[in-house]
């Protein structure tokens, strides 16, 4: 049977992990992030590095949600029930901002994002800014971003993601906690596909 592209995309969204424990193949890393949520010891900037499709953006979203959760679990996961978690799930969160630098890499894009950093969050403790493919920012945009990164407001956390760590300026690297994501193993991929197949009632 031929499936159209829409169905593939819907499946990818349907099975995108929503908790740290459902992320495949990054156990050590997700444990460290959960511990940061539990202890409340959060850095102002994180850099998630690794090849495409290993869960960098997914983990950034889960982490952002957990940081702003009003009742995180004892394990450091977001509760999924509080107003902050619900707002995030319904894509109406005023505390979590995402920028895809692959298509929004001009100095204007970064400046408008940096304007948002000045305003404290209405609900919750932090404003979290996820910048995907951060290596794609223009040099002028990098410099505009660096000004805020050097002296971030107390209520701001940046989560940057990149597939090309070597293209990130050393001045930015030195201000981030760096997390290197593992490549997916064949075993992890097979076990995840079996899990999805079972849920979809597909025999294999």
PLM regions and their residue ranges:
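P-loop/Walker A NTP-binding region and its immediately flanking N-terminal helices
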Residues: 1-178, 184-198
């Amino acid at each position: 049977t031929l499936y159209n592209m829409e169905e593939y995309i819907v499946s990818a969204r349907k099975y995108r992990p929503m908790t740290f424990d459902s992320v495949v193949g990054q156990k050590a890393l997700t444990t460290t992030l959960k511990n940061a949520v539990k202890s409340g010891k959060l850095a102002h900037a994180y850099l998630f590095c690794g090849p495409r499709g290993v869960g960098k953006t997914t983990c950034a979203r889960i982490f952002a949600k957990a940081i702003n959760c009003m009742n995180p679990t004892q394990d450091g996961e977001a509760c999924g029930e509080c107003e902050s978690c619900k707002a995030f799930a319904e894509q109406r969160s005023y505390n979590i901002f995402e920028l895809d630098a692959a298509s929004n890499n001009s100095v204007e894009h970064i400046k408008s994002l940096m304007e948002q950093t000045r305003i404290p969050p209405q609900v919750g403790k932090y404003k979290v800014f996820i910048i995907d493919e951060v290596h794609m920012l223009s040099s002028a945009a990098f410099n505009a971003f660096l000004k805020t990164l050097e002296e971030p407001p107390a209520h701001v956390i940046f989560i940057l993601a990149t597939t090309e760590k070597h293209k990130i300026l050393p001045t930015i690297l030195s201000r981030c906690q760096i997390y290197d994501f593992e490549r997916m193993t064949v075993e992890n991929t097979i076990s995840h596909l079996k899990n999805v197949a079972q849920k979809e009632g597909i025999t294999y």
